[in-house]
């Protein structure tokens, strides 16, 4: 059983190495970021809004939002109104479908916007339960070597080491310091 319980900070590193498939397309999660309710960088920090309503629902549901009005971002709702942003996957299944959606094979799932485009995740999945189709999860094998560092693209709580990645993965959105 994949351990999806816990707050965002506990859940984010446990997702590294887990296989995520959406409609049969996906790969291994290699990069995540944690956002807790008491975190000024979290969308839930100032309370519920129509945009972040999924974060105030049940854990293990999707929180999907647009970043800068351009790209969808996919998060897993955690306990205590937090979420884990899935930043990057090592693409393994459905590479041709991913490349067609992305316009080519480069950086298929390296970064939240590229990942959602490759997996065809849109706002239509906001609030969707993650234990039902189109989502499919496979347990990780072994214990991954995880590196931590500061989160990317935020302006608050920038020094928190709440970004987690698979050490040495060529599929990260950005190298760790």
Region locations from a protein language model:
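Conserved, well-structured core segments that form or line functional sites
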Residues: 1-177
């Amino acid at each position: 059983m994949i351990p999806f319980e816990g707050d965002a900070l506990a859940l984010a590193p446990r997702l590294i190495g887990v296989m995520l498939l959406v409609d049969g397309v996906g790969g291994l999660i290699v990069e995540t970021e944690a956002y807790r309710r008491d975190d000024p960088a979290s969308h839930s920090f100032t309370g519920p809004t129509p945009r972040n309503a999924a974060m105030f629902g049940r854990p293990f549901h999707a929180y999907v939002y647009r970043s800068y009005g351009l790209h969808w971002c996919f998060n897993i709702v955690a306990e205590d109104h937090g979420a884990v942003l899935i930043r990057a996957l090592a693409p393994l299944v459905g590479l041709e479908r991913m490349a067609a959606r992305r316009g080519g094979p480069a950086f298929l799932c390296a970064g939240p916007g590229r990942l959602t485009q490759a997996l065809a995740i849109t706002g239509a999945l906001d609030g969707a339960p993650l234990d039902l189709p189109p989502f499919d999860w496979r347990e990780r094998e072994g214990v991954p070597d995880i590196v931590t560092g500061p989160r990317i693209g935020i302006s608050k709580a920038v020094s928190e080491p709440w970004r987690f990645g698979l050490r040495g993965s060529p599929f990260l959105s950005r190298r760790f310091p």
